[in-house]
Design a protein with these regions (language model features):
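Signature of Gram-negative outer-membrane beta-barrel scaffolds
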Residues: 2-125, 140, 145-150, 252
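Transmembrane beta-strands of outer-membrane beta-barrel pores
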Residues: 3, 71-73, 82-88, 134-140, ...
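Outer-membrane beta-barrel translocator domains and adjoining extracellular loop/strand segments
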Residues: 5-14, 88-97, 143-151, 193-202, ...
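Residues on the lipid-exposed face of transmembrane beta-strands in outer-membrane beta-barrel proteins
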Residues: 63-69, 82, 118-122, 170-174, ...
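Repeated loop/turn-to-beta-strand initiation elements of outer-membrane beta-barrel proteins
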Residues: 73-76, 127-130, 178-181, 233-236, ...
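Outer-membrane beta-barrel signature, preferentially recognizing the C-terminal barrel domain
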Residues: 108-109, 138-191, 200-229, 268-281, ...
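Gram-negative outer-membrane beta-barrel transporters
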Residues: 187-189, 207-314, 427-429
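C-terminal beta-signal and adjacent terminal beta-strands/loops
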Residues: 302-330, 345, 356-430
């Protein structure tokens, strides 16, 4: 507890659960071992720990092997790795919702991991080269996604397995007197992916813990880089990336609301949802002047296809059925019609830098000024997320859903790039 905002103490109880259980019910306690003499929860003061207290322990061992050889114009490499991952949770509080499954050490999750990768490059002559890379890997899930609700209990996520990753890349390089070029394409496929989120779920007036499992993902794209040597001191570079990073199927979901001790299973209709908060298309042009100790660079960058983090709760099967055809959750044929993922606004950004190196009698002085977003374009979205709040309310008597006055889906949280900003760096070497 950092600041009680004027209060003297705070009861260590689950305030979300008070709407479901009475204040004296042990299930509202965050720690049954410190409920106090009246059973109202330990009094928390500034500097105390409350709500949850746990440690996640990970033990990992890896062994690598690598072999490389050059035969004429062919250079190739083969590498392999095997590993072992062990993880478990140690709870320092006995949660009232999970009295027998929150304090102490959890069960262990063990994963045998490993993978192989290879790369081959053929020199074709005349500055041309062709490369191919392939890889396959079994990777243990991250510890921060392995537990279903770590703030409340020791449960691991159901269907927790190694992620399986196939990767491939094909590239062409050219190096000449006035031009250097690189063209590459890649395709990666992942299965058994597990993702985890926790957030305040307005529909249930509760904090919620969401685990999505059995996910499949595709990552693919093309990249082009050109470097033109216009003169001995002037270069022009053109860079372009078009990529795709999205879910290939609808995920299984299990979630727990902090007002109850029961899990809910469903399908989240998140197929074709994209990776968030990164531009999937980037195009750049850079002009560089380097002469007589001067360094001047002017860079123009265009960013596009920037998606916000999607809210799984808006795409649960149960949510779409509740919305029905009247509120757009299903079409007339009974097919689910989940929301499209919210996309942020891209745009153009101009950056510049100028520097000078001076050689002195007893050292050297380097001065560099960098200015970002020279045109002060603050309309570019750098990231954000959809609100996990539905656009309807449900009549508890009739079960009918009606539209809310405020449309949460159309008003997501967005982050924007900073306006014009700069940095001056002065370094003296001796």
């Amino acid at each position: 507890m950092e600041d009680l905002l004027g209060a003297k103490s705070f009861h260590n109880i689950n305030t979300y659960a008070l709407g479901t259980y009475a204040a004296a019910d042990p299930r509202v306690q965050y720690d049954l071992n410190t409920t106090g003499t009246l059973g109202l929860g330990k009094l928390v003061y500034e500097g105390d720990t409350f709500g949850y207290d746990y440690n996640i322990n990970v033990r990992r061992a890896k062994l690598w092997a690598n072999y490389a050889q050059t035969i004429g114009k062919l250079h190739y490499m083969v590498a392999g790795r095997v590993g072992y991952d062990n993880m478990y949770r140690v709870g320092n509080m006995r949660n009232g919702m999970f009295a027998d499954n929150s304090a102490g050490k959890s069960k262990d999750a063990n994963f045998l991991t490993g993978g192989v990768k290879s790369n081959a490059t053929v020199t074709l002559g005349g500055g041309n080269a062709l490369s191919l890379g392939l890889g396959y890997e079994h990777r243990a899930p991250n510890a921060n996604t392995a537990f279903a609700s770590p703030e409340m209990n020791n449960d691991f996520v159901l269907n927790l397995h190694n992620e399986r990753i196939f990767s491939s890349e094909l590239s062409y390089q050219y190096s000449g007197s006035w031009l250097r070029a690189n063209l590459s394409g890649y395709y990666n496929h992942m299965t058994n992916v597990t993702e985890w989120q926790n957030f305040y779920f307005d529909d249930a007036n509760s904090f919620t813990y969401v685990s999505m499992t059995n996910m499949k993902k595709n990552y693919y794209g093309i990249e082009l880089g050109l470097d033109f040597k216009l003169t001995s001191f002037l270069n022009f570079k053109a860079l372009g990336t078009w990529s795709e990073a999205k879910n290939a199927n609808n995920a299984d979901v299990i979630y727990l609301n902090s007002t109850k001790s029961t899990y809910n299973k469903d399908i989240v209709y998140n197929k074709n949802m994209h990776e968030a908060s990164t531009p999937l298309s980037v195009y750049s042009a850079i002009l560089s002047y380097h002469k007589g100790g001067w360094f001047i660079d002017l860079s123009g960058n265009y960013y596009d296809r920037i998606y916000l983090s999607y809210a799984p709760s808006l795409r649960y099967g149960n949510t779409l059925r509740t919305m029905g055809t009247a509120l757009g959750g299903m079409d007339a044929n009974g097919n689910y019609t989940p929301y499209a993922q919210t996309e942020g606004h891209g745009g153009f950004m101009l950056d510049a830098s100028i520097g000078k190196s001076l050689y002195l009698r007893h050292g050297s002085l380097s001065i560099n000024l960098m200015i970002t977003n020279l045109l002060n374009n603050q309309k570019i979205v750098s990231g954000g997320y959809e609100q996990g709040r539905s656009n309807y309310t449900v009549n508890k008597t009739t079960g009918a859903a009606t539209t809310r006055a405020y449309d949460f889906y159309r008003n997501p949280k967005k982050y924007y790039v900073n306006g014009i900003n700069g940095m001056l760096n002065v370094a003296y070497k001796f």
